[in-house]
Amino acid sequence: MSKIVVAGGTPLYGDVRISGAKNAVLPILCATLLADAPVEISNVPYLHDVITMINLLRELGAGVTMNEGIEAKGRSITVDPRWVRQRVVPYDLVKTMRASVLLLGPLLACYGAAEVALPGGCAIGSRPVDQHIRGLQSLGAEITVENGYIKASVSQGRLKGGRFVFDVVSVTGTENLLMAAAVAQGTSVIENAAMEPEVVDLAECLITLGARVEGAGTPRIVVEGVERLKSGQYAVLPDRIETGTFLVATAMTGGRISMQQVRPQTLDAVLGKLTEAGACIEIGADSIRLDMQGRRPCSVNLTTAPYPGFPTDMQAQFMALNCVAEGVGVIKETIFENRFMHVDELLRLGAKIQIEGHTAIVQGVERLSGAPVMATDLRASASLILAGLVAEGETIIDRIYHLDRGYENIEKKLGVLGASIRRMT
């Protein structure tokens, strides 16, 4: 099993290219099933979850080709949905990735039936699919859960437009309903919709392919269904969580970094907290520069919340920052009930963290000490790498398959910035 070895103590300097967003490309790949001709998606990151989704699409019968592209634009994937015949998404492929549930809406909407195994993925809390099911039922779907599968059908041949109010904000629930509504008969209204940039990116992709969508990025999305989407090309937005992770890494190590082709407007909450921590940040239309040369960060307080609040996917990275910051930082997790699993591993490195329910109180220390640690989920693995970058000695991070689900070549990108980091098999 692969491990990552980090030797701390080197500030990060230089430029880095941010990959396409994992949480945008997965629903967009699912959305290609709504088209009646090939669709090309560019700026696709090479991630374990992306490969899993490609395998799922192929299992359904879709033709999928991957083009390496050029460094500046990333890979492209062309999906030809015209050969889809299968309606069952098997557990063997679904078990490692929660986003597989996003195939439910497109399959049901286009083919009138779908069976999707209940999904797997990171073990960071209960993320039930009941909102997906109730949303699709509001469009006329008949759904049961049997033997570990969500079984859905449409008795009248085509989903009908309807109105649905989410009980709680759900990103993937919003995406599933949005895709299904795009080819439903009539107008659908989605209330209390997720406002994340990845939802907006999906909507913009659907519009590019011929969908009629208004209000994406607000709590109310209106979709006027069309019969089928068309062929087209779309570029995935840059990954805001990868962007934030590299910014935090640079702030922790006292370095300087420049990023091009990013979306600063999707990172307001993160950039605000980095400024509070003492970083000097310059923002352009599609660029970010952060300078923390020779300075120790200050602790920050934060509470995770749905967008545009502070993203839960950046909580672990900021906890790592608070571990070596000056002062005491308080972190409240409100999205997932089990997302402090990285704390025990940070404690092994010498961090001072006290957990009180859904709150972590972090007393910054001047230095951490390298030690063997174990990744427990995707973002926790990133936080351990960040901690290793500032720890004395070597930090060996085990179970990094979590990392490969969401970060493309993170050790190579950090190495270009000057980090002493390598993958060991």
From Swiss-Prot:
Domain of life assignment: Bacteria
Cellular compartment(s): Cytoplasm
GO cellular component terms listed in the entry, alphabetical order: cytoplasm
Enzyme's top EC category: transferase
Active site: 122 (proton donor)
Residues bound to UDP-N-acetyl-alpha-D-glucosamine: 98, 127-131, 313, 335
GO terms, biological process: cell division; cell wall organization; peptidoglycan biosynthetic process; regulation of cell shape; UDP-N-acetylgalactosamine biosynthetic process
One Pfam family recorded for the sequence: EPSP_synthase
EC numbers: 2.5.1.7
Function, as annotated: Cell wall formation. Adds enolpyruvyl to UDP-N-acetylglucosamine.
Family assignment from sequence similarity: Belongs to the EPSP synthase family. MurA subfamily.
Protein name: UDP-N-acetylglucosamine 1-carboxyvinyltransferase
